Amino acid sequence: MKIKDAVNMIRWKYREKIDDYVVIIIDRLTENGLKEISFSEIDDVDNNYLYLKSEENTVIPLHRVLMIKRKSDNALIWKR
């Protein structure tokens, strides 16, 4: 499954529990090199980018996405 498809599946199929899901990305500015982004922060996704709901209009390239996890049981939904 492609990243875009996994993100859209969670956004639409599990929208009632959207806060239970996170995207883990590579972030060079953090100490451990990873950053969790809640699905509630995602505004849109296309073939190349995740678009976040923010004043800065943050755009994250999909090649930085490492995995998608469900927080409640730490289940791995998608992994590169």
From Swiss-Prot:
InterPro entries tied to this protein: MJ1316, UPF0248
Q: Which cysteines are joined by disulfide bonds?
A: none
User: What's one Pfam family the UniProt record gives for this protein?
Assistant: MJ1316
Query: Origin, by domain of life?
Result: Archaea
The entry sums up its family as follows: Belongs to the UPF0248 family.
Per its record, how is this protein called by name?
Answer: UPF0248 protein M1425_2629
